[in-house]
């Protein structure tokens, strides 16, 4: 094929006309023949394609410029020989293509045929023979039966079809892809022409910055593709049943199908199945390229042989190229899409198939943190949800209420913010069940407390060892008070006092034979409580934030090993509200009273100490341990007013630690919750500090009687009828514990019932009238007191 020098046409228009002419040459059998186009022919066909792509009327192109005038080399006798080589006998003319030197846009249009006939009539005497054959071809064409049916409603139609066959063909295509004039289908066709048949793949003049070697290689590449792979589909009716090559469905006789000669005469496709095997788009104007039995558009067929630059959209003929993200670039074209800085060997970010340097990407596409408002750089971690973005840090990606980190944890989005739990989303403080992270807001000292409570008689050496172990256990919770704690100080004072009374040897020796040990561990001394509370509140810190809590609370619970008072303990005290003076006012008065209590104790000789327990044994004869203990308590408390110490505090909104109690405590405690919004008040009923002196009032004489009178006059003495009525049971060795509670935004009131033994005693009294009458006669007034204050209420 000879290279013809051509003038510079309008972009793309002459290129597509030339491509179609080459296809017509191939299918008409004149592959090796070339017809040099005349300048007027190029200008005419260029204007026609341009007007078709601009949605103009086809009828406006019916001018005399449609005449294809052969060049000087094709006139005379040579012209007749070349013209007759494109035609066959009239029997085969129905399925033949028009002459190759006719533009494709001039085929199958009555208006174009009329203009062609008019122009041919004035062509000159040298073209009469060719003119008669062309007129004969038009008259016998099935695409024009001179019936007056206009096909100009389409910008392109398959060649060689009657109007009804044209409509049958287009009925097999989607409506938005049928090339009606001034329709989306026409725009689709023009777009696919530019995309499927890129001119830079075939013509050097449409390429940029090609070297001489690359220009030569492009010409060879284009000629080889046209010679080996280029073809055009033929549309006609099917005569027998065949399967569709695209969808494998059966085609029956009479269906309109598309044939591709380069893939074989037996293969056919539905009109809608004649698509590119890569992009799956309809092959525009039925122009295809084949390779290995597959159909390709011009673009993707070229890419099967050479890489294409993603920047300039040209075939890469150089030996080196850049590959990234499954794409290829010329070495000099791999640059930032914004600043055009070359990115070879540098970091980059791909967005929508285009590379960007880090600076340009941050400027154009960086997100802002929803928490701190700062830019989230490409080097920083990012968390995104529903259009919101955060830095992937513990500070930014955290709960909106409690600020706990949500990295690696499920979160709850609500109203544009994120939370760690439902409680936090409602504005409530987190509970232990809602979150497992974060510091423990409420210190736990129950393990050390329960280890110091004696449930059976034991030696003072064992108590010292337990006390030492409890101090070591509490060392992790906060700083230990050391040897100057309130519990150690009072214990040494009591030991000196008992030695002066002559009882120290008795206690250290494990007890005198015949004299029983006290059945209960000693109670809490409120002077010790006052010292501990004073130490706690010295820095105006709450019980939840004070590091001295766990060191002072165990000291508060330490008891004097030599004493034999009944024992009750305080488990939970809220110290948020009261000041130092409020907390220690009542305890200071009690300390003054206790100084008076020491004198009768010092006057007790060995026989007095023995007499104290002898009276206790005589009292218990004939009754069970639990019943008689309650009656003795009631006898001492009959005519005495009830006192109590109250600790007022603000509402505790912090999460409480889990209560670690044994099964016996859990069985004798019930928990009920009542939701309210009022402020809470904690009321703690303290036990009688000198209950054994009251029990031995009849046997000890005037000293014990004076002690009881001192207790009556004490304004701060607290007597809980519940605790005193059940003080004879072994279950009272345990500390009364508040049940763990969950906060839901309001105050909870928990009612702690009596222990199981006291409850059982009440049932026995109710079932046995004789026992109830005896108890009422022995201790009048006690049942009334017990019924009135049966429960210790913590609100």
From Swiss-Prot:
Could you tell me which residue ranges the LIM zinc-binding domain spans? 242-306, 307-367, 368-430
Q: Which taxonomic lineage does the organism of this UniProt entry have? A: Eukaryota, Metazoa, Ecdysozoa, Arthropoda, Hexapoda
Stretches assigned to the PET domain: 135-243
Q: Which organism is it from?
A: Drosophila pseudoobscura pseudoobscura
MF terms in GO: zinc ion binding
Which key words are in the record? LIM domain, Metal-binding, Repeat, Zinc
Q: Where is this region: Disordered?
A: 30-96, 427-487, 616-684
Q: Is Transcription one of the keywords UniProt gives this record?
A: no
Q: What is this protein called?
A: Protein espinas
The UniProt similarity line reads: Belongs to the prickle / espinas / testin family.
Q: Where is the composition biased (Low complexity)?
A: 52-66
Superkingdom of the source species: Eukaryota
| Bias (Basic residues) | 666-675
The record's InterPro entries line, in alphabetical order, gives: LIM1_prickle, LIM2_prickle, LIM3_prickle, PET_domain, PET_prickle, Pk/Esn/Tes, Znf_LIM
Q: Which SMART domains match?
A: LIM
Matches recorded under Pfam families: LIM (PF00412), PET (PF06297)
Q: Where is the composition biased (Polar residues)?
A: 650-662
Basic and acidic residues: which segments have biased composition?
459-471, 637-649
């Amino acid at each position: 094929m000879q290279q013809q020098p051509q003038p510079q046409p309008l972009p793309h228009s002459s290129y597509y006309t030339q491509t179609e002419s080459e296809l017509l040459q191939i299918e008409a059998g004149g592959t090796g023949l070339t017809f040099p186009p005349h300048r007027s022919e190029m200008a005419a066909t260029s204007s026609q394609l341009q007007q078709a792509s601009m949605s103009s009327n086809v009828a406006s192109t019916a001018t005399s410029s449609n005449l294809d005038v052969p060049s000087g080399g094709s006139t005379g006798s040579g012209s007749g020989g070349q013209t007759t080589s494109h035609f066959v006998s009239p029997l085969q003319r129905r399925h033949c293509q028009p002459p190759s030197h006719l533009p494709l846009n001039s085929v199958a249009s009555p208006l174009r045929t009329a203009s062609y006939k008019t122009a041919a009539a004035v062509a000159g005497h040298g073209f009469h023979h060719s003119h008669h054959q062309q007129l004969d071809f038009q008259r016998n064409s099935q695409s024009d039966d001179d019936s007056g049916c206009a096909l100009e409603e389409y910008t392109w139609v398959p060649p060689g079809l009657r109007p009804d066959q044209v409509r049958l063909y287009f009925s097999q295509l989607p409506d938005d892809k049928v090339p009606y004039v001034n329709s989306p289908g026409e725009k689709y066709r023009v777009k696919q022409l530019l995309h499927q048949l890129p001119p830079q793949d075939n013509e050097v003049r449409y390429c940029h910055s090609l070297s001489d070697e690359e220009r030569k290689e492009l010409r060879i590449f284009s000629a080889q593709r046209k010679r080996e792979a280029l073809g055009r589909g033929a549309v006609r009716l099917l005569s027998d049943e065949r399967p569709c090559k695209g969808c494998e469905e059966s085609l029956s006789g009479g269906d309109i199908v598309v044939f591709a000669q380069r893939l074989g005469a037996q293969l056919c496709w539905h009109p809608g199945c004649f698509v590119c095997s890569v992009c799956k788009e309809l092959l525009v104007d039925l122009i295809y390229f084949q390779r290995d039995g597959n159909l390709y558009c011009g673009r993707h067929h070229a890419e099967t042989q050479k890489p294409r630059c993603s920047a300039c959209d040209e075939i890469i003929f150089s030996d080196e190229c850049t590959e990234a993200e499954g794409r290829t670039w010329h070495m000099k074209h791999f640059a930032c899409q914004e600043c055009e800085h070359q990115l070879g060997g540098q970091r980059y970010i791909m967005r929508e198939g285009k590379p960007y340097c880090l600076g340009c990407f941050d400027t154009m596409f960086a997100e802002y943190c929803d928490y701190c408002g700062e830019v989230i750089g490409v080097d920083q971690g990012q968390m995104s949800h529903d259009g919101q973005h955060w830095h992937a840090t513990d500070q930014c990606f955290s709960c909106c209420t409690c600020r706990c980190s949500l990295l690696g944890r499920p979160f709850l989005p609500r109203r544009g913010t994120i939370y760690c739990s439902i409680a936090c989303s409602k504005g409530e403080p987190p509970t232990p069940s809602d979150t497992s992270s974060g510091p423990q807001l409420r210190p736990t000292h129950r393990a050390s407390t329960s280890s110091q409570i004696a449930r059976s008689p034991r030696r003072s050496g064992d108590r010292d060892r337990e006390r030492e172990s409890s101090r070591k256990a509490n060392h992790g919770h906060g700083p230990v008070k050391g040897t100057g704690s309130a519990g150690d100080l009072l214990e040494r004072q009591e030991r000196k006092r008992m030695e002066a009374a002559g009882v120290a040897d008795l206690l250290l020796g494990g007890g005198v034979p015949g004299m029983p040990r006290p059945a209960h561990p000693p109670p809490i001394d409120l002077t010790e409580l006052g010292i501990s509370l004073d130490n706690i509140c010295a820095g105006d810190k709450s019980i939840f934030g004070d590091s001295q809590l766990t060191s002072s609370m165990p000291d508060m619970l330490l008891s004097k090993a030599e004493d034999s008072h009944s024992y009750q303990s305080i488990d939970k005290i809220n110290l948020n509200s009261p000041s130092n003076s409020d907390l220690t006012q009542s305890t200071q008065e009690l300390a003054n009273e206790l100084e008076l209590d020491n004198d009768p104790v010092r006057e007790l000789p060995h026989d007095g100490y023995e007499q104290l327990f002898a009276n206790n044994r005589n009292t218990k004869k004939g009754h069970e341990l639990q019943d008689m203990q309650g009656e003795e308590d009631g006898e001492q408390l009959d005519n005495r007013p009830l006192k109590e110490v109250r600790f007022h505090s603000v509402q505790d909104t912090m999460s409480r630690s889990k209560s670690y109690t044994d099964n016996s405590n859990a069985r004798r405690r019930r928990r009920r919750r009542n939701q309210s919004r009022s402020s809470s008040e904690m009321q703690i009923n303290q036990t009688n500090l000198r209950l054994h002196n009251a029990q031995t009032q009849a046997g000890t004489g005037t000293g014990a009687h004076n002690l009881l009178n001192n207790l009556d006059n004490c304004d701060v003495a607290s007597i809980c009828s519940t605790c005193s009525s059940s003080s004879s049971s072994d279950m009272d060795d345990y500390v009364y514990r508040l049940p763990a509670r969950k906060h839901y935004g309001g105050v909870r009131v928990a009612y702690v019932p009596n222990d199981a033994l006291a409850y059982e005693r009440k049932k026995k009294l109710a079932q046995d009238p004789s026992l109830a009458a005896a108890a009422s006669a022995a201790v009048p007034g006690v049942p009334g007191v017990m019924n009135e204050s049966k429960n210790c209420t913590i609100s």
